[in-house]
């Protein structure tokens, strides 16, 4: 086992990365190794997808499957070894079908990629785990050095984050052939074990640029189906009655669940990154979508244990449900998996609803506590002139984007302290689950404009980018000249690709933490600092002083 993709990874003087029987996330060495094998199979599939496009062949089954199954290897998504192997077998079957299509056009068609002809050696998980050793990401570290390995992983993990957003967009009916062609090209190239530093840096920026397009079609998918988010108050306390909790990012799953629970007497609560769903008109129209439950994903083992109903996980983040003894009432969807947990194959939530009706639910309604969400792209752009007016009248000094992933490290209190230290004449724009560090606090307003503005899920960084570009255009300056600072928390691969997206668009002087990714070497950090001004957090006082004086 070697895995260094998330913030929790083991860090020692000898090196970084989980490399024992179990990773810090709870992933076993077996599952981790089999995920490496799956990635190799997917690289071979992408190699043939690139070749097929040379013949004008576009196989939508391949395009749909490839990023979805890659998403299953993201942190806290799928811990189920047999399902990971199943994805690998499906990847090889699709590859062979695609290869046959190519050969039907050109009898001499071939693919030079080292992963292009990968076959699984056995049905036995132990044998497959031994085979996976050929594909462990650090297998040639001694030959290439830590810097090249770090850049490879930056590209691999960044592409994994983009694949997750591609799947979210695909579920909503969005498809862009250029994006998929670019994805396959990059995935196939990474399967050649590249070792050129400049080429890898260019690839990282290409992934960021591609992801901006992915976020654009994801935004289109969400707003076309569910309307543009508008500011909406959400209750974060319990309402009397039977209940279901839904977590993750998949708004379509939430919509289906709301449709199927309507009139059943079962209330639905959002959790984690589902919180922004309350801002969408076509979702909040369901009156039994009664509120948001819980806090950051890392607290779920305590909070889920207390929830008096079933829980549905639609994407990341799931952690060991046996710890809180709620494994008999947590359900996984799509690419999510945990051994022994019930999995919903289709869109029928009937078994979950039946379980909810058999449980007690909340015995009484608590005194409501309302927070506001729903500052989506359209709302933000509508406020652009107001922001400019406030800046021109010196009523608004600075905007801080404080957001990103949450996590369990104590150092993450930095983001709570930072938000509460923001001066009263400054605005906080937030997104993703890092907001749970401070989104239930009171921040007041500036002439009626809330000082805390919740822009949505992690992918809604797209809305923040569009707002920044619009403000810069209206003010006749560059984005980096705006009174705007980005203070970002990272945990996993979606955050990595958001960072690459921002860097690829030329956004500079981003502050990130609480720690640097374990695959960032000192040399790589120095390059990113020199080129983009990227740096790690220090203290709230020092960072605030520096950002306000920039």
Swiss-Prot record:
GO terms for biological process: response to hydrogen peroxide. Binds 1 [2Fe-2S] cluster. Binds 1 hybrid [4Fe-2O-2S] cluster. Keywords: 2Fe-2S, Cytoplasm, Iron, Iron-sulfur, Metal-binding, Oxidoreductase. One of its GO terms (cellular component) is cytoplasm. Hybrid [4Fe-2O-2S] cluster binds at residues 249, 273, 317, 405, 433, 458, 492, 494. [2Fe-2S] cluster binds at residues 3, 6, 18, 25. Its EC number is 1.7.99.1. This is Hydroxylamine reductase. The gene is hcp.
